[in-house]
Amino acid sequence: MANAIVEKAKERMSHSHQNLAREFGAVRAGRANASLLDRISVEYYGVETPLNQIASITIPEARVLLVTPFDKSSLKDIERAINASDLGITPASDGSVIRLVIPALTEETRRDLAKEVKKIGENAKIAIRNIRRDAMDEAKKQEKAKEITEDELKTLEKDIQKVTDDAVKHIDEMTAHKEKELLEV
């Protein structure tokens, strides 16, 4: 039972890492990345549909995304959705494909994005600490209910803290890597 608490905490922390990676993927680093378009939904035959389900997204050059709709009639809808998004990229359509040229980042923009990355990383660490708190509370409840001994509680708390420390270290590494990527010229 005690191991289940640690395993559940590990699993929840793993989900936090995946969410962080997804959020970092949405922060543009001055080079083309298909994940920039992951959050864009297009109204396609009256239904909000993720862009990657109605078009192929390729990267022909370092700073260019090429969006090729499977159905050419959806080109205008895709263009409208990209314009409405908060990407800050203007789509250029030639009738069959949409080219998105990713502008080079200014030094100021890079610093702002690095601050945003730090904030996202800090929020992920807060989520990890909340998971630790929940796991510790669960362990204390079990000890109070006499399901585990006081010694087992101490061991469990150490295990939970080790898992938490590893998760926070991983978040710090991910954040540092993304910051480095952003600040490269």
Curated annotation (Swiss-Prot):
Protein's cellular compartments: Cytoplasm
InterPro entries: Ribosome_recyc_fac (IPR002661), Ribosome_recyc_fac_dom (IPR023584), RRF_sf (IPR036191)
Record-level Gene Ontology MF annotations: ribosomal large subunit binding
Cellular component annotations (GO), alphabetically ordered: cytoplasm
Gene3D superfamilies membership: 3.30.1360.40, Ribosome-recycling factor
GO biological process, one term: translational termination
Cell inner membrane as UniProt keyword: no
Pfam families, per database record: RRF (PF01765)
Main location: cytoplasm
NCBIfam families attached to this UniProt entry: frr (TIGR00496)
Its biological purpose: Responsible for the release of ribosomes from messenger RNA at the termination of protein biosynthesis. May increase the efficiency of translation by recycling ribosomes from one round of translation to another.
HAMAP family linked to this entry: RRF (MF_00040)
Similarity remark: Belongs to the RRF family.
Name of the protein in question: Ribosome-recycling factor
